[in-house]
Amino acid sequence: YRRQRQMCIRDRMGTMSVEVPEIDQLLAMTSPARYGDELPDEGGRGGALHLSSVLPAISSAIGHPIPTAIHADPKRLQEALGLPDARSAVVVLVDGLGYWNINMRLGHSPYLRSLMADGVNQRPIATCMPSTTVAAMSTFGTGTCPGLTGMTGYTQLNPDNGEICQLISFKNAPAPLKLQQQPTIFERLACLLYTSPSP
């Protein structure tokens, strides 16, 4: 079955060389990915190939590099992710759609298939731990990590009263601006653009 999947991917992609792991390997617990600006060692995860590096890398690509508490070199992230310089950028994010999900269904998306033919796109980026939407979206938006954003899951301890709070409706939760104090990359870009002298 595995050989059949590999051949199917190669047939659809032509030069595609990504080998989809067996399901038990995909579901196995792994150590958390590290943060930073360097490419991970062979077989390693994270560093420049992390969800938190995407927006700092894009900020560099559009000419306004925004470093964060865990990513000091947005230009290095841009190079690691293979992003060209651009005047503007559009980010399309689909919650829950991972690298292996895409690879196993490339026949359904000709555009994604064309992107995956580029070697720089033939490697996954890591997400944060825990990988819930609350933690991951704040990690993505700020270019930092759940420990800095204070957004660690759907339910967590409210530090103000010691009760469990819910972070979808913010029931029993601190005020959102009090809980999540890291500025987003978008907020920081807006500050740059509004304080820059106009031409």
Where are the language model's segments positioned?
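Single conserved hydrophobic/aromatic residue that forms the stacking wall/gate
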Residues: 1-11, 194-199
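Active-site nucleophile/metal-coordination loop of metallo-enzymes that catalyze phosphate/sulfate
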Residues: 14-89, 96-186
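Hydrophobic/aromatic beta-strand patches that form the interior of the parallel beta-sheet core
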Residues: 90-92, 196
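Anion (oxyanion) recognition and catalysis
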Residues: 190
